[in-house]
């Protein structure tokens, strides 16, 4: 059965991916999951420099489930490009890199580094706190989201997915601010 899909001009063999943050870059699960069967791997967030993440405990049981607060622990873009991208390239799956940052210049530094890497898409995590916006989630302001997205689209050579925060009264305002810059990026 053909389950292929085209997402932003990228042909996937199937529409199955893992959510960012749940799968690392796949190495942790390679002995348990056939990565070749996934349409894509969406990596854990990567920043311009390594982040230690939150102190432990990071997971707590709550009524009806559990909560976690990992804090976007990651190795930083340099080690990610050196170690994680080559690991993922050995598999027959698309690579979506989740990009995180505290400020626009941090996001842009990671996007610039990834632009020439052999990846298929970028997912920009704009629900991270932003030091330049009074510690509000960057993705809660339509103007900030639109401005950052436009800057990223000028640099990225891969399609860009904006990971919107659900922590807003009306997410449609944020989404609508991106419509005029939503055309796929294509660089020669």
Predicted feature locations:
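N-terminal capping/small domains of soluble enzymes
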Residues: 1-95, 101
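Active-site-adjacent beta->alpha loops and helix N-cap segments on the catalytic face
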Residues: 77-81, 131-152, 168-170
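Conserved radical SAM core fold
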Residues: 47-52, 126-138
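Active-site glycine- and acidic-residue-rich loops that bind
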Residues: 21-23, 98-109, 161-177
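Single conserved hydrophobic/aromatic residue that forms the stacking wall/gate
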Residues: 179-183, 187-188
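Surface-exposed amphipathic alpha-helices with a cationic face
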Residues: 5, 81-89, 115, 149-156, ...
